[in-house]
Curated annotation (Swiss-Prot):
Pfam families: Alpha-amylase, Alpha-amylase_C, CBM_48, GlgB_N
Catalytic activity: Transfers a segment of a (1->4)-alpha-D-glucan chain to a primary hydroxy group in a similar glucan chain
Coiled-coil intervals, chain numbering: none
Protein name: 1,4-alpha-glucan branching enzyme GlgB
Name of encoding gene: glgB
Record-level GO cellular component terms: cytosol
SMART domains recorded: Aamy
Active-site residues per Swiss-Prot or TrEMBL entry: D416, E469
Biological process annotations from GO: glycogen biosynthetic process
Keyword Glycosyltransferase part of the UniProt annotation: yes
Biological classification of the source: Bacteria, Pseudomonadati, Pseudomonadota, Gammaproteobacteria, Alteromonadales
Role played: Catalyzes the formation of the alpha-1,6-glucosidic linkages in glycogen by scission of a 1,4-alpha-linked oligosaccharide from growing alpha-1,4-glucan chains and the subsequent attachment of the oligosaccharide to the alpha-1,6 position.
Length: 745
């Protein structure tokens, strides 16, 4: 015979609930009106419970005791004469303890219809505010709102420390129209570990990390972590206000690329990472002293495999645990801003790894990726490619970009592997790729996504820099979106990098035959807003360090590297240099070890470091080196054809009264005395910098700091002078004048 409590369940609903097959749990569990609103019933499912009472949250009084429906843990009961719903807790007696639990099934949906619309359409900039785990207060009750997108799952539960990882304890509410699942849990603590337990259509169960988690466990564990309530108090208003009005394409930008795990380490054997406080105390003063304007962080989103350097992230919203928590990262960025140093972040939106706890077949289907491997799999890295055609995927990525810029006050993003996003046949042979709707090779969905991304980010975050690592000749990468471009602010100049490093590796005897490798970049320098980048990719995987690439003895190696840096800092375009290159690291980069800081005990390495510092100082002081980077009138060759001597000479111009600077770069070990060079005006010229000075470890050949112009036309200039050009050296000359202003922010 059926008990009274059993009558409170629909036919078979209790059995379906126990078997994990009842997905519409909010219609069954919790408090509900019955008998046409004349009574209230409370139903709950609590494994191992012996007794359950209903307690009013308003006054703490017991309202009713629930009847046990069966031994599995189903309880139900009416609440006497009460007919109006109220907030309540369940006082649960277990064999070893008694707990008061605020029933999550008494709360309605917390999702906003406008948020849901924008998420589905691909235009949500703050999806992380309602997806993932967010602290909320509902009717004076504080708790965590969990929400996940899994439209093809049969059932989704949140499991964690707070429910002993029981997948039947907190089954989530399903929103059929948009594929979201949600639940509000009051009894959850900061730092609690959790996952989403999904039942696929084929009956398989899989525990997945939260795609929107803002904190994750240390590898090899992979649970998501409920965030802290307290957030970092920002003190960078002055920087943010200045940034908003800065035109970076006209400003000095000298970027120091850093992999936080290997810049420096601590511990007896260098086995411990620096935490963010260590980095605040050591990295920021170092970057400031060296004169860099920005730090570019290699990816800091959580990644399980150290060898990926962060370029295969699983927790796109979670700062990696390796160096501290989110507040620690915010404190580091805040300290950078207070030291007038910008912070850029490498951001990976081109692909994601196949780790089973991540996005791969998230709800049993190819939700974030393409079903067809000819579009969905990256052949080079065996990773998966985002389906940019799905609105929810676009919202996931757009919101993530906004998350880093808004919540962490980052000053821009450098998008990795953009070329692989733009082309459907990237690294694929014929027959291994699918053409677009027009029969072409361009990935139209990815192109539209990048255009939308840049347009939205520049509008929402004034003064940021969006940078593309794009290695092909795709037209319009930095062209505005309203003119058909992708809308990036800058593009890495991969052509200049490849040509110049190839030239650098040649014996000086043969450089005369490859002179165009250093001059060709000026043929296309104004086709995009280029950034000259010597990144981590150039000093790893057997490529050797920059110093190692250069032929000759040690003196020639160091002299050549100094001259190369001088040419780079004089060339139009913003600058980026990977850590360690500023003091001529001898070994190629190894992510498992600190940089070789002990090398700074030796004068040649100190000399390169001083040279970079002084180049940065000069770069920031003279507007001619940055203000017209992307306008042809800012650069003029004096002589680009002197291949016989491998000497390059040119002038950098600014605007109006800006002081012009003359660069003379000699890439052979031959000393040239009485070498005539054209000058942009008459009078005295200062030898502002000479890479061959003994201060930098050179042979001290030069012009004693001063050059006097003659009224003798030369190289298209009205004036000229006879100068000494040092071997493997770079001279930077300018009219004698007071030092101009700092052109950085």
């Amino acid at each position: 015979m059926m008990t009274q409590a059993q009558t409170y369940f629909y036919d078979g609903s209790d059995v379906a609930l126990l078997n994990g097959q009842y997905t519409d749990v909010f219609s069954l569990l919790g408090m509900h009106c019955i008998n046409e609103g004349k009574a209230l019933v409370v139903r709950c499912f609590l494994r191992n419970a012996q007794k359950v009472d209903v307690i009013s949250l308003k006054d703490g009084r017991k309202v009713a005791s629930l009847e046990r429906v069966n031994e599995a843990g189903l309880f139900a009961g009416t609440l006497g004469r009460r007919v109006k719903p109220f907030l309540y807790a369940l006082r649960v007696v277990y064999p070893l303890c008694e707990l008061d639990i605020i029933d999550p099934y008494q709360f309605g949906s917390l999702l906003d219809s406008q948020d849901l619309y924008l998420f589905g359409e691909g235009g949500s900039e703050q999806a992380y505010r309602f997806l993932g785990a967010n602290w909320r207060q509902v009717d004076s009750v504080e708790g965590v709102h969990f929400c996940v997108w899994a439209p093809n799952a049969k059932r989704v539960s949140v499991v964690g420390d707070f429910n002993h990882w029981d997948d039947t304890r907190h089954v989530m509410r399903q929103h059929m129209a948009n594929g979201l699942w949600e639940i509000f849990l009051p009894d959850v603590a900061e730092g609690a570990h959790y996952k989403f337990d999904l039942v696929y259509q084929n009956g398989e169960r899989h525990a997945k990390s939260d795609p929107m988690a803002t904190q994750m466990e240390c590898a090899p564990n992979n649970a998501s972590i409920v965030p802290k309530k307290h957030q970092h108090p920002w003190a960078d208003t002055q920087w943010m206000d200045k940034r908003a009005t800065t035109a970076w394409h006209r400003a000095a930008m000298s970027i120091y690329e850093v992999q936080l795990g290997s810049w420096r380490r601590k511990g007896e054997f260098g086995e411990q990472y620096f935490d963010y406080q260590d980095l605040i105390e050591q990295l920021i003063p170092y970057v400031k002293e060296q004169g860099f304007t920005h730090i570019e962080l290699m990816p800091v989103s959580e990644y399980p495999f150290d060898g990926s350097w962060g370029y295969q992230p699983v927790g796109l919203y979670a700062p990696t645990h390796r160096f501290g928590d989110a507040n620690g990262l915010k404190a580091f960025i805040d300290a950078c801003h207070q030291a007038e140093i910008g912070v850029l972040l490498d951001w990976v939106a081109a692909h994601f790894p196949k780790d089973p706890h991540g996005l791969v077949r998230f709800d049993g289907t190819c939700l974030y990726e393409h079903e067809d491997p000819r579009k969905g799999t990256h052949p080079d890295w065996d990773t998966l490619i985002y389906n940019y055609d799905r609105g929810e995927v676009r919202s996931f990525l757009l919101s993530n970009a906004c998350y880093w810029l808004r919540e962490f006050h980052l000053d821009g993003l450098r998008l990795d592997a953009v070329s692989s996003m733009l082309y459907l046949d990237y690294s694929r042979e014929p027959g291994q790729w699918l053409p677009n709707a027009y029969g072409g090779r361009e990935n139209l969905e990815a192109i539209h996504f990048l255009q939308m991304l840049n347009q939205r980010l520049y509008q929402a975050f004034p003064g940021i820099c969006m940078i593309a690592e794009e290695s092909t000749a795709f037209a319009g990468v930095t062209k505005p979106t309203d003119c058909g471009g992708l809308g990036f602010g800058f593009k890495w100049n991969m052509g200049w990098m490849n040509d110049s490093l190839s030239y650098l590796g040649r014996d000086p005897i043969y450089r005369q035959y490859h002179h165009n490798q250093l001059t060709f970049s000026l043929m296309y320098a104004y086709s995009e807003q280029f950034m000259l980048s010597i990144s981590h990719d150039e000093v790893v995987h057997g490529k050797g360090s920059l110093l190692h690439k250069i032929p000759g003895d040690d003196w020639q190696k160091f002299a050549t590297l100094r001259a190369y840096y001088g040419f780079m800092w004089g060339h139009p375009g913003k600058k980026l240099l990977f850590m360690g290159s500023e003091f001529a690291q001898r070994d190629e980069w190894n992510h498992n070890h600190s940089l070789d800081w002990h090398l700074l005990a030796f004068e040649p390495h100190q000399g390169v470091q001083r040279w970079l510092r002084d180049l940065n100082q000069l770069y920031r002081q003279f507007p001619a080196l940055s203000v017209l980077d992307y306008e042809s009138q800012g650069f003029r060759w004096l002589d680009c054809d002197n291949g016989r001597d491998s000497i390059f000479s040119f002038v950098r111009y600014g605007e109006g009264s800006d002081v012009p600077l003359v660069f003379v770069v000699n890439m052979t070990p031959t000393l040239h005395q009485g070498f005539r060079i054209g000058l942009p005006q008459g009078g005295d010229f200062c030898e502002y910098l000479n890479s061959d000075s003994h201060l930098y470890g050179g042979s001290n050949q030069g012009n004693a700091g001063k050059v006097i112009a003659e009224d003798l036309p030369w190289q298209g200039m009205a004036s000229s002078a006879l100068i000494t050009v040092p071997p493997l050296g770079c001279l930077i000359l300018g009219p004698a004048t007071d030092a101009p202003r700092d052109t950085s922010l």
